[in-house]
């Protein structure tokens, strides 16, 4: 249980309640038996699910307080729920389009008393409000180009979209150049190691309001993918 022990140590360093993480993992394992919620189980649930989510979110938010965060396509709650258990003072919204996962996330919210987490059955590109969130994250949801087209309108001015990517991140940024050229942004790439694997945080800071065509419809996003 190497990675579970790492989460225990992580919680001790930050005065977080590890028992909440155990309850969360138990809920995932219990409900995953009957509903296909995630492919993670056992040790990979602690590594790829919990620990990686904590490292990703802390790097994305830089330990800021009193900020508004959006997690797109959260599934069973990665990366938002582990971070919410660690940092209870930040407001977190989750957009998840699949009903069975929405139901599970609402159960987790209730069982773990996550009052500052809100779950919506929602696709990002269908949400018309703009300039809302200080940090928008998405893990294994879509390419840089897709995420910009679908969700960059949700990022507040001076806020950031932060996407975790592997070694092919340069190709994704290159493929997104046409969309990036329509925006005024600052793109910064931070390299960091997750469990001996090289990962990259692509941070896209909004410096000006998005043009009117944002967000693109899912039909247009698929056409340009």
Swiss-Prot record:
It comes from Mycoplasmopsis synoviae (strain 53) (Mycoplasma synoviae). Specifically methylates the N7 position of a guanine in 16S rRNA. Keywords: Cytoplasm, Methyltransferase, rRNA processing, S-adenosyl-L-methionine, Transferase. GO terms for cellular component: cytosol. It is found in: Cytoplasm. It comes from the Bacteria. Gene3D superfamilies: Vaccinia Virus protein VP39. Its EC number is 2.1.1.-. S-adenosyl-L-methionine binds at residues 73, 78, 124-125, 139. One of its GO terms (molecular function) is rRNA (guanine-N7-)-methyltransferase activity. Belongs to the methyltransferase superfamily. RNA methyltransferase RsmG family. The keyword Transferase applies. The keyword Transferase applies. Transmembrane segments: none annotated. This is Ribosomal RNA small subunit methyltransferase G.
């Amino acid at each position: 249980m190497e990675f579970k022990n790492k989460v225990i140590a992580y919680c001790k360093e930050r005065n977080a309640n590890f028992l909440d993480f155990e309850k969360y993992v138990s809920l995932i394992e219990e409900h995953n038996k009957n509903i296909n919620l995630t492919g993670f189980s056992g040790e990979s649930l602690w590594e790829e699910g919990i620990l990686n989510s904590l490292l990703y979110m802390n790097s994305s938010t830089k330990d800021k307080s009193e900020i508004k965060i959006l997690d797109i396509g959260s599934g069973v709650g990665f990366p938002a729920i582990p971070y919410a258990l660690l940092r209870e003072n930040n407001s977190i919204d989750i957009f998840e389009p699949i009903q069975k996962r929405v139901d599970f996330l609402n159960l987790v919210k209730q069982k773990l008393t996550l009052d500052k987490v809100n779950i919506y059955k929602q696709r990002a590109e269908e949400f018309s409000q703009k300039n809302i969130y200080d940090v928008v994250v998405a893990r294994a949801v879509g390419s840089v180009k897709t995420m910009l087209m679908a969700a960059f309108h949700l990022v507040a001015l001076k806020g950031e979209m932060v996407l975790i990517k592997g070694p092919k991140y340069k190709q994704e940024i290159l493929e997104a150049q046409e969309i990036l050229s329509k925006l005024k942004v600052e793109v910064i790439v931070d390299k960091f190691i997750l469990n001996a694997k090289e990962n990259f945080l692509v941070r896209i800071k909004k410096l000006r309001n998005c043009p009117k065509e944002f967000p693109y419809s899912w039909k247009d996003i698929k056409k340009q993918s």
